[in-house]
Amino acid sequence: MAHARHLFLFMVAFTITMVIARLDFNPTIINEDRGRTKIHVGLLAEWTTADGDQGTLGFPALGALPLAISLANQDSNILNGFDVQFEWVDTHCDINIGMHAVSDWWKRGFVGVIGPGCGCTYEGRLASALNIPMIDYVCDENPVSDKSIYPTFLRTIPPSIQVVEAIILTLQRYELDQVSVVVENITKYRNIFNTMKDKFDERDYEILHEEYYAGFDPWDYEMDDPFSEIIQRTKETTRIYVFFGDASDLRQFAMTALDEGILDSGDYVILGAVVDLEVRDSQDYHSLDYILDTSEYLNQINPDYARLFKNREYTRSDNDRALEALKSVIIVTGAPVLKTRNWDRFSTFVIDNALDAPFNGELELRAEIDFASVYMFDATMQLLEALDRTHAAGGDIYDGEEVVSTLLNSTYRSKTDTFYQFDENGDGVKPYVLLHLIPIPKGDGGATKDSLGMYPIGTFNRENGQWGFEEALDEDANVLKPVWHNRDEPPLDMPPCGFHGELCTNWALYLGASIPTFLIIFGGLIGFFIYRKRAYEAALDSLVWKVDWSEVQTKATDTNSQGFSMKNMVMSAISVISNAEKQQIFATIGTYRGTVCALHAVHKNHIDLTRAVRTELKIMRDMRHDNICPFIGACIDRPHISILMHYCAKGSLQDILENDDIKLDSMFLSSLIADLVKGIVYLHSSEIKSHGHLKSSNCVVDNRWVLQITDYGLNEFKKGQKQDVDLGDHAKLARQLWTSPEHLRQEGSMPTAGSPQGDIYSFAIILTELYSRQEPFHENEMDLADIIGRVKSGEVPPYRPILNAVNAAAPDCVLSAIRACWPEDPADRPNIMAVRTMLAPLQKGLKPNILDNMIAIMERYTNNLEELVDERTQELQKEKTKTEQLLHRMLPPSIASQLIKGIAVLPETFEMVSIFFSDIVGFTALSAASTPIQVVNLLNDLYTLFDAIISNYDVYKVETIGDAYMLVSGLPLRNGDRHAGQIASTAHHLLESVKGFIVPHKPEVFLKLRIGIHSGSCVAGVVGLTMPRYCLFGDTVNTASRMESNGLALRIHVSPWCKQVLDKLGGYELEDRGLVPMNGKGEIHTFWLLGQDPSYKITKVKPPPQKLTQEAIEIAANRVIPDDV
């Protein structure tokens, strides 16, 4: 009773609020323009079909557009100074008519189109091509959501696939992971279902059955019920049904389920998605009239419908059965519209406008408006408000993309008094509700008898791009829970023992004949196992492995907002070489709670802590062995998902083998091999079973020169991680040199954990590295791809590394072990215990502790350590100097200095700079008549000359692309108003110098340089890390480019803004060119720069030497400036 009373009070309060908020809704249709500028909007609608029948658009909906335009024309806050008018075209659902209308309206300067109303892909594509905004009100097609193809298309109607988000949130809320899906076999519902399947794959939901049915017609009494067979096929292995179909079909499916007897127990639930429900009255919404199938209700809509029942026995018991079935149904549908006085007035105005010109509709009965009217009204108002915002911001109301951009990711108040949205794709977004049958006792909320009603028990809303579910509350602020049929809790998606009892054991069969002693023993064992199980589960849930990223301190220099600083890049070589401990190159080093650790990044967006993952992490924590690198923990904080292993300061075995300064004698090698074998023995006997990626880089050496195996286990944790984008093709192939042929042939299906036999093969490859001190297959002299291909092919005899170097250095027992470990058939390889026996001669006479032997090695290193340090320090200083010089050439000196110091360079706005653009007129023709090497030599000579000239001015060369040359002055160091003079003098100097330039291979050709300069504001900053560039952004760059492209050969084209600064400086001679039309800028009054004050002397620059023949010099001496410049 409390629930129903709360809902009733909510409806009353909402109605009063809406009426007060909209009390002033009293539009008058206005046709006169009142002296304002006229703009036009086009309306496309399927009023009638080609045969003259009623179209898909409900009759009264047309009246919504003139109503919206009239309200906007009366509102001084919308397009003030404009008079909005419209034209409309009945498309008859003919694409050609719609596209012709759009083209015609575009030619006539219409500011937007509402429609097309029947299909939308072709008209939307055309509108996007013509850059005219189009907002549709009934289109439910998926392709139009692609903004790269339909940049000017929006729709106020939400696409039906949005209901999938509400369905998934419902399943999440009630912990339902397995469902069967029943789908009406039409395009709309198939699209929704396909979308749901994609979402299910992302969230590990399971679809037990997919069932399709042909449309069910409740009026066709001879038509067989299609649902009975579906339920018979699925009921034994299903508890939750998701239904996609019309509301009448949902009713019939629920009644069939009731007849089949599956709803009596309350173990089954039907989740229906009603996407076509157009509710106009909250009373209808709750009274089930849109679900219940009564002739009385149909008669209220249209008396003709009632005559359909004259030959059928139809009683109230059918509706009683439907109500009983609906107790096991929950429905996801759109939020309702409350029928209020404001809604009735809106309906009246829409209908009146539809009856009036230019539609001149005919109406036998007083029609009811539907959601198409709301969507059309909203579409029109949103178009006009977008035009108003664009105009107010100084934009171009005829630029469709600019207009549409003001609506993307915006929220507006719909005519339904509900807040709707446009998402980033331009699709309408509306709230959804979750309905359930709730009893309404007599006297509650004005009810005259006990009844049932469909009330929302939750709402679905989209905020910040994410859908969320909010449960309804009663008047005591308690969650309004569903009244599950014949049960207190939501039904399970699978019986506790599984659909066939496979998850439970019938202990009675085993214990029935047991004697008391056995019961006592068994009870004790059960208690023991329960204790162990609880202890194990407690260990799984303890999260002792979890690392808080805030407690991790990396040795990397403080990073900028992009994750890496330029200083890190420049000094990376320094940090590796100067580290006396020879840090592991391929891992980030850090400290966690005082322990130095190696951080291995896992390239995943998030980690799902499934049982398998937690089990892995517990196993890793329990791994303890001298030759297994200890696991410290794992961080799952985004974006720092990583695995922390103990840091071994001597680096990897691969690092040691590549370091020629470390001399490895037989005793040293024997100790390393013994450590590696002991580590593999422990790994193969543990729960991890195998490594899977064993290679020399995954064998690390600590300060005591003990070899430890790392990068093992955690296969579920790392499953699905993305490829390292920084890893090149060569590195990817090189990683496979240790992989056994059977795993190479498995390609993408290779188990992440590998196999023990695969580890034995990898061990053999490591042995060849140890005794050759070279990378695997180094003597084979083939490309990596060819080597891997031959290993994978399984040729006879198997393709393996050439052992010339190994034969000369390794003892016989090692050679025998290598050959025994790499046969093609994994079954022919020995296990690790047999390998240890084969290599036992290596340990003869050696102690397990290598420290005594290492003391002698370190003494030998001490003799040349000082000399080695001095030599490496000098090499380091040289490389550092080269790096800094290169960076100063790539970037402005002040910017390069900041980056070298590790200071992040933030983008900066410069209020006034001057930009220079130039190109060579006729360069394309000259290039076509030249060889590529001639073009390169020409540009090299020309730009060498230019670079020598600009070094005398306060300018910075931004870039050269082909024959284009770009300069800027006034940044990154501001120079007052001098920037315009610096650019102008540079331009004058370059123009004079090019007149004496000779094209080596075509000396008769006169290079015609065309220059444009402009002054204004821009933003500059460093872009990129691998090859950083100092780039300029802003309209000033575009305008400078337009000045160059609209100039003339051997002339300097100056913008009016640049002229103002030059006039302020004085000393520059300019000539008025007049108005020049420019693409995207309109007409601009521009000028020619003719010269400068003689006191501004041009610095003499010695032209760089050109390789010219005497004949070329003589030809060039007789050339003249062409008449056309």
From Swiss-Prot:
Sugar-modified residues: 185, 409
Cytoplasmic side: 532-1125
Cleavable signal peptide: 1-21
Limits of the Protein kinase domain: 571-839
Family matches, as PROSITE patterns: GUANYLATE_CYCLASE_1, GUANYLATE_CYCLASE_2, PROTEIN_KINASE_DOM
Protein name: Speract receptor
Organism in which the protein naturally occurs: Strongylocentrotus purpuratus (Purple sea urchin)
Enzyme class: lyase
CDD domains: CHD, PBP1_SAP_GC-like, PK_GC-A_B
GO annotation (BP), single: intracellular signal transduction
Membrane topology: Single-pass type I membrane protein
Single annotated GO MF: GTP binding
Catalyzed reaction equations: GTP = 3',5'-cyclic GMP + diphosphate
Listed GO CC annotations: plasma membrane
Enzyme Commission number(s) of this protein: 4.6.1.2
Record InterPro entries: A/G_cyclase, A/G_cyclase_CS, ANF_lig-bd_rcpt, Cyclic_nucleotide_synthase, HNOB_dom_associated, Kinase-like_dom_sf, Nucleotide_cyclase, Peripla_BP_I
Pfam families named among the record's database cross-references: ANF_receptor (PF01094), Guanylate_cyc (PF00211), HNOBA (PF07701), PK_Tyr_Ser-Thr (PF07714)
Keywords: cGMP biosynthesis, Glycoprotein, GTP-binding, Lyase, Membrane, Nucleotide-binding, Phosphoprotein, Receptor, Signal, Transmembrane, Transmembrane helix
